[in-house]
C-alpha cells in the first residue's frame, strides 16, 4: 500500500474521526439494509468483509508485492504467507464442500480461458501495484491511485463478461476436483500436499538465490486471520470468498443505467449473472464482502493515522494504474477470478485450475515487472 496517501504530519492526531465514523456508520447502515431486505444471515458477510479489510490493511498483506519480490529477488516470505492462508481455508472448504449439501467449492474448467485470463491478470497486477483484494483495501485505505484502478477494473470485468463465452467455446478439460477422486478427506490431504510441495519449491528457489523465505510475523498472523475469515465467508455464503464477480455486477448495473442492453450477452443470460443483474446488490454475496472490505480498510486506516491530502502521482503512474485495472478486470473475468477467487478459492477447494491459474498469473507478472519502468515504476 502506498504510504504517501496516509502520511501524517508529526503533530497530527492519531485518529481521523470523520473517516472512522463514516466507515463505521456506513457499515452499520449496510448491515441494517441487508437485514431489512430479508437476509439477516447475509448481513454477516458485510461484517466479515469489514474484518477482512482491517486484516489486509493492518497486516499489509499484498499478493502483488509478494509475487514481485519473489520473481525479482527470490524472497519467498510473502508467497509462503499466501500458501498458509490457503491451507487454513482448505481445512474446512474441501471437506464441507464435499460432504454438506448446498455448499460448493471454487471450481472451473482448465483451458485457454483460465490460462489467458490469469496471464493478463498477472500483467495488470504488477502495473496496478495490487490485485483484486488489494485494489479494494488500498482504495478503502485512502489511495487515490487505486480508485482509478478500481474504476477501470470494474470496466474491464464487464468487457470480459462479454468475451468469456467465446473463450469457453475454445474448449478445455472439465473441472478436476481432488475430492471427486479421493473423497473428502483424501481430497483435503491432496490439497494440503500440493500446498506443501509448492512451499518447499519456493523455499528451495529462495535458498538458491540467497534470499529469505521466512514470512514476517505480521504476515503469518495476517494469513491465519484472513484464512479464518475466508472460512467464515464460505460458511455463510456456501461458496468460497470471491471478489471480482461483485465488481462485474456493479459495472453491469452502471452500464444498464447508462442505457446498455445486456439481453443479447450470453454471460448475462446464465442463471447466476442474470439473477445478480436483476436483483439488488444486497442479494449478491460477493458485493457484500467487497463493500464491507472497503469500509473495513477505511476504518483501519482512519484509526491508525489521518488521511493526508497529497499530490497525485505522476501521469505515467496513473496511466499504469488505469491500464493495470483494465487488464485485471478483463483477465479476472476470463480466468474465473483473481488471487482470491481463482488462486486461494481454487486451491483451497482442491481444484486443479487454481494451480494452473497461479502458474499463468506468475508468467504474466514476469511481463508486468518488465513493463513497470516504462511507467516510472520500480521493478522491486
Task: Annotate each language-model stretch with its function.
Residues 2-380:
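Membrane-interfacial helix-loop segments of redox and metal-homeostasis proteins
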